[in-house]
Amino acid sequence: MALLTDDFDAVVASRRAVRAFLPTPISRKLISEIIDIARLAPSNSNTQPWSIHVLTGEPKQALSALLGIAHNDPSADPLAHLPDDLARKYRERQEKWGELFYGLHQIDKCDDAGRARVSGLNFDFFGAPVGLIFTIDSNLKKYSWLDYGLFLQTLMLTARSRGLSTCPQVSFARFQSLIKDFLHLDDSQEIVCGMSLGYADENATVNSLRMPREMAQGFTHFMGFDR
């Protein structure tokens, strides 16, 4: 089987976190096709630790409404998805992301209300017709989360190869109890993240944003090669 390297490279290069979608419906058949390819991702000892909840229509709207209320509750705990003592190079990248993202929305660094309003769009899945919630057994160790990352990337690239776009969203992990209650899950499950899935609105300004990436030589270390 011949592999089309240029085509694969184009799929990888065109994948980005899309934050504005068209309402165009996505068929269950197409979503199932994407998941059926993503399931081939590798995992430690073939444990395959992933579980997906696929929402559209009324269920998606109902979950979004509940999450919107929770997000706007000032007593809700923030999501600590990065350590307070973040190393300088990671902090600088995070700050650059905030500068570019919120700058595009013309929101000042000190405008907490504006930032909360924009981040709240996460919970409407950025207008995408399909929302995905990913869960994992809570007693699994960090290596299974590595497996999960491989699965998520495979799913996103498979979706992209079919003309769809995605946005992986760790923000959903902030509301573990709410989402687990909605999905009728017990405490043996943990929310990994959410994901928006649909066709990108190419006319939306937010989708023009491209984040900088460090060049490969900045983090790659070769040993034993001639040059």
UniProtKB/Swiss-Prot annotation:
It catalyses: 4-nitrobenzoate + 2 NADH + 2 H(+) = 4-hydroxylaminobenzoate + 2 NAD(+) + H2O. Its cofactor is FMN. FMN binds at R15, R16, A17, V18, R19, R213. It comes from the Bacteria. NAD(+) binds at S45, Y102, I107. The keyword tRNA processing does not apply. Binds 1 FMN per subunit. It is an enzyme of class 1 (oxidoreductase). Keywords: Flavoprotein, FMN, NAD, Oxidoreductase. The keyword NAD applies. InterPro entries: Nitroreductase (IPR029479), Nitroreductase-like (IPR000415). One of its GO terms (molecular function) is oxidoreductase activity. Its EC number is 1.7.1.-. Pfam families: Nitroreductase. Nitroreductase involved in the degradation of nitroaromatic compounds. Catalyzes the conversion of 4-nitrobenzoate to 4-hydroxylaminobenzoate. Required for the catabolism of 4-nitrotoluene. Belongs to the nitroreductase family. This is 4-nitrobenzoate reductase. It comes from Pseudomonas putida (Arthrobacter siderocapsulatus). The gene is pnbA.
